[in-house]
Amino acid sequence: VVGKPYSFLHIDKAEIDLDKGIDLYDEQVYAKASENLKKFEAEGVYINDTSKKYYFYRQIMNGHSQTGIVGCASIDDYLENRIKKHEFTRADKEVDRIKHVDICSAHTGPIFLTYKNSDVLDAIIVSETEKEPVYDFVADDGVRHTVWSTSSTSVDESIESAFSELDALYIADGHHRAASAVKVGLKRRGENTSH
């Protein structure tokens, strides 16, 4: 991250901003991650988007393209097994992510979910990604990243309706991040009963 002051690694792997040899699980690492996130938000590098909408994210690398929907899922979907797991998690990795999410007050690690084919969602993705993107750039590693936001409330409602018709979502990557988010969510609910 030399020469990249706004790299996300300053948040996700904040030990890079501390003395070499620091224990990766030292409380200073989580505090530095939180400090960096707040700094980047204050500087406008990262934006806390409070609107209720979805995004579409496409990556193109070596001629391969993949496009997905970016949104939030409820911890209740996980607890009620509508988000299906296929791996066990390790307690030490969960504790690390729990501390990170809790101290940063942000879930900074995406969880890659898949779902059974949905013609409705496919049609929405095609339609929405024909519009002007919010971001479109090629990173230093040659990967092209393109992001679109939904164009209307009715599109958001159509996506939400289509997801409600699915029996389940499946974790493809992010079992530890998902389990940790759920545990922090339950902790926060316990602390704020009106949540």
Regions found by a protein language model. Give the residues of each.
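A cross-family signal for N-terminal binding/gating loops and helix N-caps
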Residues: 1-195
